[in-house]
Structure formats: structure tokens, C-alpha cells
Swiss-Prot record:
An annotated GO BP: L-leucine biosynthetic process
EC number: 4.2.1.33
Protein name in the entry: 3-isopropylmalate dehydratase large subunit
Keyword Glycoprotein annotated: no
Organism: Buchnera aphidicola subsp. Uroleucon aeneum
Protein purpose: Catalyzes the isomerization between 2-isopropylmalate and 3-isopropylmalate, via the formation of 2-isopropylmaleate.
Pathway assignment: Amino-acid biosynthesis; L-leucine biosynthesis; L-leucine from 3-methyl-2-oxobutanoate: step 2/4
């Protein structure tokens, strides 16, 4: 029987399956951070349980950390408490931790791939919705809730139903100045923020084949913004080259054996997909969101749509509400709208390739005097590499603040946030109301 990539990975991780209930899947890697793990550890203690596979568990601090100084005391009392709890929990249960003083510390979805922890064919979970990022490696990766975090810590398994299969084929030639972020935003805008609900999406096509791993991670990172459980891309030579000689990658004879298995990880020719979509990006222009949902997006040269012309009552109300919150009017160009802040960072776009691209545009240019702009590398490794290449100097000369690694302004859980009514051009993945701070407006 022909199978999709998702079905192959799912089936190979079944510990137990009953026709009357969901399957129990083995989890190869469990990623932790300071925000969604404290309650799970407390539950373990209350039930007198231990962590079943501490060596298949990895933790870092990212959501709450200060990007100005290396101190757990710099982001408020709640953040400090969560980071202290993570340190204590990892010490007690013998879990590897990149804490605030570790030179490798950074965003969990940046660290795991760059260290070779993320490998094709694995199952990976984390108490964070953008765990789908790891799907770029042909990995079944998805976010889980705190009660599920507890379950994985205790059993290294997770009860999980079978999701439907969706294929998004991306074809054409990538236009100049168009990035992976533009492509996935365009797809979300075209198909809708619930188009992937109940599905795992496999991205394929010549555009995907020509993408770097950094670009593929951006695509899979935002699969959840289509409502999908996760995103997947079949591994290939680009994947293998990226993983070769990483710290946690297989080596020697184990590398060769892994390659043999990884080459099997692709959808069979006649595999059935419940939904198939083909998207041609040959004429695509850079994309930017105007509203409070990722599917409220337009090309940079388009006007904000007139919500009065939207047929769907629900979408019309949503568009009107978004315009009111964002302080925008229909039929205007976003290029004429003034911004207050710029954020380059997040698990979507804070890797070395992203910083290189941004620095090329900024070289010999200056940030407007009224704009506050920050760059937050995704990890210590990315930061060090950028500094070796002199990218930090380009950003600083342009008027940007060069910060320490962390989630930063992607979400309002630390001191990097928007003030009420401020408008930000952001590299992050969500433009929800208040996402970057109460009353903040995100593009």
C-alpha cells in the first residue's frame, strides 16, 4: 500500500494502536522551555514519577529572557520564577539545559536543528505551537499542551490520532526580493488560516527543492498558521549536507545507515492525499499583513482591501474589526503608513541566512530617527557567526540595536514589546491583537 511521508513516520512510531482509540506514539525528542513546563514537572512530583528518557529531552530558555543582558532577573518576577523553575527542574531530573549563561542558548526551534538534534524521520514535540518548524527535515513535529508535556516526560509517548494528508505543491521561479516568508504568507492568504485544519501539510515542488534548509524551516514554521497540525518536507541532499558533521548528527557507519533510512522518507508516487493544492509563485511580490490574522495579507504594491466588498459576513466583520484595531483604512497603501519599530528575529526568521539577507538591504542605509529597530539572533551560534562575518556592524551602523538571543518581540512575555498604539514591521509569525504588547499593531 502506498503511503505519504506523514503516514510512514506515524506508522513507524506506533507503540500501541487499537481500532477503537487513538494510537500511542513513541516520541524521539522532547523539547522544553521555561513557560509551558513548570506545571508539568509539578505534576510529576505530585504523582511521584520520574522523567522516563532524560537524554531524549532538551531544554533552553527563550520566551522570557532579556535580550539586553544575560540575567534571569531582567524580565520581571514571573519570568524570573519560570526560569528558576526550569533550572531546578532540569537539575533534579537530569535534563540537558542551555541556560541564560550558556553560549549556545537561544530559541529552541533554532538550536535543535543547528545542533543536529532534529533528524529526518523523528517525532518531536514541544509545548510551543511553532514546533512545526522541524518538519523541514522530514520530521513529524508538533506543539503540545502542558498536560501532554507531563505525559511525554513520564512515558516518552503520546496519544495521537491520525490526521488527514494535504499536499501543497509550490511551482515557478522565485522572483527577485521574494523570500520563503513571502511565499508562505501568500499561501496562507490564498487558502485561508483554517485551510489546513485537521491535516498535516506536505510541501513539495521545484521551489521547495531549490530552497535552503533555513527557507524550508520558515515554510514549515508557519504551517500552523494555516490551521495545520504540522508541516513536512521530504529530506534530500540539501538536508543531508546541512546535517553533516553537526554535534548531535550520526557519524561514521551510523551516518551511512541513517542516510539509507532517510532516503526512504518520501511520499510514494501513488500515495493518497485528502487535499491537493498547486501554487505558482512566478509573479509573486513581497507580502505584508495588514490585519490581525496571518491570512489578512497583501502584496507590498497592493491596497488594503475594502471590507465592504467582501461577500462573507464573517470575513467582512473580521476585516472591519482588523482595520479598526490596526488604525488603517481600506484602499490605502501600506507603503504610505509610518511605523514605530522594526523587529528582525523569531523562530521564523532569525537564522544566519535571514540576517545576511537583511544586512544586504541595510548596508549603507540608515534607520529613520523616529524608528526603534532591533535585531535578535536566534541563537548564540547565529550571533557569533554573524559577528564573525561583520553583519552586526552593518546593523549597528544602520541604526539597529544588536541584541542577545531569545524570542524577544515575537510575543509580549519579556521586556521587548510594543507600547499601546505602536506599529511594528516584524519578522515574526503572528500578527494577532496584542501579540507584541497590549494595543500593539504588528505587520
Amino acid at each position: 500500500m502506498s503511503k505519504t511521508l506523514y503516514q510512514k513516520i506515524y506508522d513507524s512510531h506506533i507503540v500501541y494502536e487499537d481500532k477503537n482509540s487513538e494510537a500511542i506514539l513513541y516520541i524521539d525528542l522532547h523539547l522544553l522551555h521555561e513557560v509551558t513546563s513548570p506545571q508539568a514537572f509539578n505534576a510529576l512530583r505530585n504523582k511521584k514519577r520520574k522523567v522516563r528518557q532524560s537524554k531524549k529531552t532538551f531544554a533552553t530558555m527563550d520566551h522570557n529572557v532579556s535580550t539586553k543582558i544575560r540575567s534571569i532577573h531582567a524580565s520581571g518576577s514571573m519570568a524570573q520564577k519560570q526560569m528558576e523553575q526550569l533550572i531546578n527542574n532540569c537539575t533534579e531530573f537530569n535534563i540537558p539545559l542551555y541556560d541564560i549563561n550558556n553560549p549556545n542558548q537561544g530559541i529552541v526551534h533554532v538550536i535543535a536543528p543547528e545542533k543536529g538534534m532534529t533528524l529526518p524521520g523523528m517525532t518531536i514535540v514541544c509545548g510551543d505551537s511553532h514546533t512545526s518548524t522541524h518538519g523541514a527535515f522530514g520530521t513529524l513535529a508538533f506543539g503540545i499542551g502542558t498536560s501532554e508535556v507531563e505525559h511525554v516526560l513520564a512515558t516518552q509517548t503520546l496519544k495521537q490520532k491520525r490526521f488527514k494528508n494535504m499536499k501543497v505543491e509550490i511551482i515557478g521561479e522565485m522572483p527577485k526580493f521574494v523570500t520563503a516568508k513571502d511565499i508562505i504568507l501568500f499561501i496562507i492568504g490564498k487558502l485561508g488560516s483554517s485551510s489546513g485544519a485537521g491535516h498535516v501539510i506536505e510541501f513539495c515542488g521545484n521551489v521547495i527543492k531549490n530552497m535552503s534548509m533555513e527557507e524550508r524551516m520558515t515554510i514549515c514554521n508557519m504551517a500552523v498558521e494555516m490551521g495545520a497540525k504540522s508541516g513536512l518536507i521530504a529530506p534530500d541532499e540539501i538536508t543531508y549536507k546541512y546535517l553533516k558533521d553537526k554535534i548531535y548528527s550520526p557519524f561514521g557507519i551510523f551516518w551511512e545507515k541513517s542516510l539509507d533510512y532517510w532516503k526512504f522518507l518520501k511520499s510514494d508516487k501513488n500515495a493518497y492525499f485528502d487535499k491537493c493544492v498547486t501554487v505558482d509563485i512566478s509573479n509573486l511580490a513581497p507580502q505584508i499583513t495588514w490585519g490581525t490574522n496571518p491570512d489578512q495579507v497583501i502584496s507590498i504594491d497592493e491596497k488594503i482591501p475594502d471590507y465592504n466588498n467582501i461577500n462573507s459576513i464573517v470575513k467582512r466583520k473580521s476585516a472591519k474589526s482588523a482595520c479598526e484595531y490596526m488604525g488603517l483604512q481600506s484602499n490605502t497603501y501600506l507603503t504610505n503608513i509610518s511605523i514605530d519599530k522594526v523587529f528582525i528575529g523569531s523562530c521564523t526568521n532569525a537564522r544566519i541566512e535571514d540576517l545576511r539577507s537583511a544586512s544586504k538591504i541595510l548596508k549603507n542605509k540608515k534607520v529613520a530617527k523616529h524608528v526603534t529597530a532591533i535585531v535578535v539572533p536566534g541563537s548564540g551560534l547565529v550571533k557569533n557567526q554573524a559577528e564573525e562575518e561583520g553583519l552586526d556592524k552593518i546593523f549597528i551602523d544602520a541604526g539597529f540595536e544588536w541584541r542577545l538571543p531569545g524570542c524577544s518581540m515575537c510575543l509580549g512575555m519579556n521586556k521587548d514589546r510594543l507600547n499601546f498604539g505602536e506599529r511594528c514591521a516584524s519578522h515574526s509569525n503572528r500578527n494577532f491583537e496584542g501579540r507584541q504588547g497590549r494595543g500593539g499593531r504588528t505587520h
